[in-house]
């Protein structure tokens, strides 16, 4: 018996990992063209398949028996062969409902906006109806109301769900609408999971509004599909364990601090402890521009900051890294989104009297210059950081403190 994921262009998929974690190691990826679908569905070796874009409607049409909820939504993402007949389900529905619960977002009686008009948006619409949403509006590129009509809902919308790929890697940090203008907003969901935090979610985080990316959606729908495939009753426990493991593997750890605090040392120690690649942004820059002090002297600090921002943008799109930044990266506001999109940011601190200025052109001038820098930059560091760690030159203790916080904030 074969299980797997059907799509036209799959690339990297988390689905095999999800199903393997639930005991199904016989899960494959099936890339097929539209002309191959009839033959594919007729393959007697197939026992269960998940379906992704663009074949969810085709899957519904290929089913002999369709679950009423999937029929209502108008598409199928899970097919199981029973007694020689294909039975179709929509477990994306379950994934979305779990995501709302996971984020603590209550849609009952709320005014909701869905961005997009594809298969996922149809699923989300039905789920919102079933959960008692008061009113549901779709904003679209193709038909009215359009994305540009978002201002019409600034005073009424309470929940926003993005069902489009806008903002997904490698096109991050693109964004459809500015949610900071919505005065009654209570919850935001973005079904994108790479990056973990799109601009939409970074804005929600800044506004201190409950929000969630698409990874819980992906994992929960996969677990519900596995229940159909394997006849099991997997639930929240399994979803959260898989989600935690994937977060642990993917979330970057970002180190920021005053120059000379010890980011490089701590970063290397973290990399060794976690078995991760440690990226030192200053070292990567020097491979490209030569000595930083010379570059700043000859080209000026603004030119250097632009080079630094380009390097941060490059590594910020990647996952599973430890990233040690330069001391002044926080002076460029756009660096925050590039660092935070896939990472948790840690500010390392220690008394300014302990800091070295050797070889650091921007902090030369002794203790008074360092105090000036500290006074200017401390609010910037604090605005970037999710956690502040006192580093007393004991790298193992600092690493342990970071890892304790990291583990506690995976979900």
Residue ranges and their predicted role:
Residues 240-248, 269, 273, 379-411:
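NTP-dependent small-molecule kinase module
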Residues 131-147, 282-289:
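NAD(P)-binding Rossmann-fold cofactor-contacting core
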């Amino acid at each position: 018996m074969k299980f797997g994921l059907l799509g036209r262009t799959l690339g990297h998929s988390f689905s095999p990992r999800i199903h393997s974690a639930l005991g199904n190691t016989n899960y494959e990826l099936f890339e097929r063209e539209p002309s191959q679908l009839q033959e594919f569905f007729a393959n007697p070796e197939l026992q269960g398949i998940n379906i992704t874009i663009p074949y969810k409607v085709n899957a519904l049409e290929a089913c002999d028996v369709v679950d009423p909820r999937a029929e209502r939504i108008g598409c199928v993402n899970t097919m199981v062969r029973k007694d020689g007949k294909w039975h179709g389900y929509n477990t994306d529905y379950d994934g979305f409902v779990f995501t709302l619960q996971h984020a603590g977002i209550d849609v009952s009686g709320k005014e909701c906006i869905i961005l997009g008009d594809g298969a996922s948006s149809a699923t989300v619409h039905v789920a919102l109806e079933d959960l008692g949403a008061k009113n549901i509006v779709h904003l679209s590129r193709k038909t009215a109301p359009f994305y540009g009509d978002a201002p019409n809902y600034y005073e009424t919308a309470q929940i926003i769900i993005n069902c489009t790929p806008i903002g997904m890697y490698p096109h991050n940090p693109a964004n459809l609408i500015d949610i900071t203008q919505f005065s009654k907003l209570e919850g935001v969901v973005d079904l994108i999971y790479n990056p973990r935090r799109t601009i939409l979610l970074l804005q929600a985080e800044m506004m201190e509004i409950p929000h969630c990316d698409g990874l819980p959606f992906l994992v929960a729908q996969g677990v519900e599909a596995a229940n159909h495939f394997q006849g099991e009753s997997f639930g929240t426990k399994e979803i959260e364990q898989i989600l935690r493991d994937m977060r642990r593997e993917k979330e970057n750890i970002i180190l920021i601090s005053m120059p000379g605090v010890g980011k490089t040392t701590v970063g290397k120690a973290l990399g060794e402890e976690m078995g991760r690649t440690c990226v030192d942004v200053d070292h990567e820059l020097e491979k490209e521009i030569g000595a930083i002090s010379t570059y700043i002297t000859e080209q000026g600090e603004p030119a250097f900051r632009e080079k630094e921002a380009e390097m941060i943008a490059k590594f910020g799109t990647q996952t599973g890294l430890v990233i040690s930044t330069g001391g002044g990266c926080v002076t460029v506001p756009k660096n925050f989104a590039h660092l935070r999109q896939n990472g948790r940011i840690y500010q390392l601190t220690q008394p300014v009297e302990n800091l070295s200025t050797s070889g650091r052109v921007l902090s030369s001038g002794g203790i008074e210059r360092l105090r000036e820098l500290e006074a200017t930059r401390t609010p910037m560091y604090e605005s970037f950081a999710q956690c502040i760690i006192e580093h007393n030159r004991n790298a193992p203790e600092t690493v342990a403190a970071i890892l304790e916080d990291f583990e506690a904030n995976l979900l």
